[in-house]
Amino acid sequence: MGQSKKLNKQPSSLSPLVQLAGIRKCFDGKEVISQLDLTINNGEFLTLLGPSGCGKTTVLRLIAGLETVDSGRIMLDNEDITHVPAENRYVNTVFQSYALFPHMTVFENVAFGLRMQKTPAAEITPRVMEALRMVQLETFAQRKPHQLSGGQQQRVAIARAVVNKPRLLLLDESLSALDYKLRKQMQNELKALQRKLGITFVFVTHDQEEALTMSDRIVVMRDGRIEQDGTPREIYEEPKNLFVAGFIGEINMFNATVIERLDEQRVRANVEGRECNIYVNFAVEPGQKLHVLLRPEDLRVEEINDDNHAEGLIGYVRERNYKGMTLESVVELENGKMVMVSEFFNEDDPDFDHSLDQKMAINWVESWEVVLADEEHK
C-alpha cells in the first residue's frame, strides 16, 4: 500500500466495447441504479463487485437485455442497443444455476443456441466440438448433465455461451455453487479461457478474493453507484474511501489527528496516541481527523521484553492463528483497539511464534499507509 509501490496500469490503447451512460433503474419505485456511467473495453475481464443488493446483477441484466432501463443509454460497438431485445444482442449470459437442459446431452446443450439461430447443420458439429475442446470436455459430449461434476456443468454452460461467438460474455456469480477447491481451480481456468478466446468477460461476484484473482479491472459498487473503478492492485492498495477499504480484504483502520504539515507529502500526526509522519496527498489543517489504513501484511511487529525499549504502537498479543504460510496475530493496543498483523511463517526465528499476552511494538514502512479524510468530520 502507499506511495512507494508502483501500480500496474491497464494499457491506454484499449478500445471501448460497451458504454453505459446515465443508467437509472427502479423496482417498485425504489431506485436500484442511479446515474451509472461505465465503459467496458474490448478483450478485458471486468468484475462488478459489491455486497448483496448493490445493483451489480441488475447492471448485468441491463447489459444482457433481460431488464429495461428507466433512463440512460447502452452502446455495444458504437451501436445503441438500449431497446434491442436480448436475443438480438451479441451477448451471452452464464447464470449461477447454469440452466442446463437435463434431458439433453452435453453436445445438444451446447448446440441448442446454434439450432435456434438456424445455423446450417454442417457447421453445428465442428463448432460445438471446438467449444467443448476449449473447455476440455470434448470426451463428455454424449453425457447428460447429471453425470457431470459441478465444475464440468459450469464449463458446459460456458461452452454453450461461447459457441455463439458473442462479443461479450456475462457471468452472474457463476462460481458460487462450487466447493472451495473447485472454485479456486475454476478461477484460474476461467481467466485462461478468457485470454484464449479474446472475448470480453463481465463477471458479477460478492467474493473479493475471486475478483482480485481473475480481473483485469474491478468496479466496486454500493447502493446502485460505483465507489471505485480500477485494477485489482489499485483497488487493494489505494482504496478511495472507507467502504472500499473495508470491503476488499482485511484492513486496520487507525484514528489520527493532524499536528502539522512537514512538506508537500508528509504530515506530522498523532496516530492512536503515537506521534509519527504519514503521507497525505490532500490539504489538511492542524487538528483535522484522519484515518490511517494499513493491511495486516504491511505491519511490522517486534517483541518487547523488560530489557529493551521499542518505538511504535504498543500492545499485547490476544490471539494467534497459524495459517500455514503465515501467522496471524491479534494485538490489543493500550487504548483497547484490536490490530490484525500477518507475518510470513519463519520457524527459524525464535521470536516468531509469539506467546499470548506478549508485549509488542507495531510499526510500518513510512509511506506504505493509505490516508483518508474522516468522512464524519470533514
From Swiss-Prot:
Keywords tagged on the record: ATP-binding, Cell inner membrane, Cell membrane, Membrane, Nucleotide-binding, Translocase, Transport
Organism in which the protein naturally occurs: Shigella dysenteriae serotype 1 (strain Sd197)
Subunit composition and interactions: The complex is composed of two ATP-binding proteins (PotA), two transmembrane proteins (PotB and PotC) and a solute-binding protein (PotD).
Locations listed in the record: Cell inner membrane
Function: Part of the ABC transporter complex PotABCD involved in spermidine/putrescine import. Responsible for energy coupling to the transport system.
Class in the EC hierarchy, top level: translocase
Pfam families: ABC_tran, TOBE_2
Taxonomic superkingdom: Bacteria
GO (cellular component) term, any one: ATP-binding cassette (ABC) transporter complex
Membrane topology annotation: Peripheral membrane protein
Enzyme Commission number, as recorded: 7.6.2.11
Family: Belongs to the ABC transporter superfamily. Spermidine/putrescine importer (TC 3.A.1.11.1) family.
Positions with a binding annotation for ATP: 50-57
InterPro entries: AAA+_ATPase (IPR003593), ABC_SmlMolc_Importer (IPR050093), ABC_transporter-like_ATP-bd (IPR003439), ABC_transporter-like_CS (IPR017871), Mo/tungstate-bd_C_term_dom (IPR008995), P-loop_NTPase (IPR027417), PotA-like (IPR005893), PotA_ATP-bd (IPR017879)
The name this protein goes by in its record: Spermidine/putrescine import ATP-binding protein PotA
Catalytic activity line of the entry: ATP + H2O + polyamine-[polyamine-binding protein]Side 1 = ADP + phosphate + polyamineSide 2 + [polyamine-binding protein]Side 1
Record domain ABC transporter: where: 18-248
GO molecular function: ABC-type putrescine transporter activity; ATP binding; ATP hydrolysis activity
